[in-house]
Amino acid sequence: MADHNLAHTTALLARTPATLDALLRDLPEVWTLTNEGENTFSAFDVLGHLIHGERTDWMPRAQRILQFGETRPFDSFDRMGHLRESQGKSLPELLDEFGRLRSENLDELRTLNLRPEDFDRRGKHPALGVVTLSQLLATWVTHDLTHVHQISRIMAHQYRETVGPWSRYLGVLQCAGHSADA
């Protein structure tokens, strides 16, 4: 049986919107619209991606596991779906939307009244195969942390040359991660 602590999961998930709001709101666009190069995300794009996941990924997949198990695979996730959804919106609008959607999703998650055995329930991912609800929820948290790190890395990238020789001591500039397709 999975040893999943839902309180620990929701504690972090609940903080991500405020973390991003504190980091990004009211910054000059050079910080939020600049990326790391061709085919990479800006902080604005990452936020749009997180919103798209709130709408189409985490809770819909949790519901699918609970309702259908492995008999009905998850819908594929459109990694670029955020481009349509973010078009014409401002960063403050995206920050507000992310906060609202995350709050709604966490409320929905709480109303499921999950029991310990529910975390072992299985669903089918279109690329990864069989996954458990526990794995999905742990991935949701880790996905948030990945993108908080990514936003920090994107922003640090703006000063990659300016820091001069100190770059060797700044791990965020040495990170092998990238924003392009995996």
Task: Label each PLM-derived region with a short phrase.
Residues D3-A14, T40, F44, L91-L95, ...:
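Amphipathic, non-membrane alpha-helical segments in soluble helical-bundle scaffolds
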Residues T16, R79-R121, V131, Q135-H143, ...:
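Acidic/histidine-rich alpha-helical segments that form the ligand environment
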